Amino acid sequence: MKEFDYSKLKDRTWDNEILTYVAQIHEYKGKQELYMQQKPVELKRLIEIAKIQSTESSNEIEGIVTTNARLKQLVEDKTTPRNRDEEEILGYRNVLNIVHESYDAIPIRSNYILQLHGELLKYTAFSYAGKYKNTPNEIDMVLESGEKIVLFKPLEPYETPDAVECLCNEFEKAIDEKIVNPLILIPNFILDFLCIHPFNDGNGRMSRLITLLLMYRSGYFVGQYISMEKAIADTKEAYYAALQKADQNWYEGENDPKPFIKYMLGIVLSCYRDLEKRIMLTEKSGKKSTAYDIVKAYTAGTIGRFSKKDALVSCPSLGSSSIEAALKKLVEEGAIIRTGAGRKTMYMKKTD
């Protein structure tokens, strides 16, 4: 049976890049607590935006898609699913809500992971929802010649239940005994989870939901306000490259998890920086600022083209109509240029 022993992490040497990531994220964690006290309105708006982006991005990575309008309706519980993709999207939204609202009541145990998987596929007809895999699930790649090569071979179905149980026990023990910083431990757990590949379907989505769960339980809440799933989707190639480097010789216990740890810490840090940028924009505009002032300050800091949706995400204190009116005024004043029409409308700063 594959065994896990996180006590060995205590004796490992972590390079300066990882230690710098950890130190910077820890500093942002302190700012996060200040934001939660002083910026509740802006953060509430960011939560709603992040939910939509997280649900969209995590599913899109797996090729599960719907229209923007349908996605928003599904996330806001204003419609019912029309097809299998929408059934899976709705399931993700439900688990995301559970993690957001009850993270402190969800221990890292095998039976809870199974329950979350059951919720993920709750609206589908899949018979394996909430159950560990019953068939092998090699990770393959098909070459242009048509030849199929095996990139990674996860654990066999019969090994999976005990492996997940052991993995969860080791994680909880490492957290309780403070063996290593949670920011280093969490990516290790997620890497091992992905290498086990415990389900017939939904492993990637479950790994991202569990990442949020573990981060929240350790006091890092940036994923509530800035979509970590979107950050991963935007760097998908780097994600898979880091995973492939980190899973080499995993079964023998001789793999090097550092590439995946660095990638995940980079994602967390980028999300914290994004959060700070959005909060600072509201502070820079001032309490008496109008929607026009806030949007103008946002556009001044943009590089290249941006959409109304981008402005809405970056100005969490404003509604859609306020942003639209501000953009219209800025176009009329010649401060920004509008291109395209309808859904393809884009804006950019007017250069000298």
Predicted features along the sequence, with ranges:
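FIC/Doc superfamily catalytic core
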Residues: 1-352
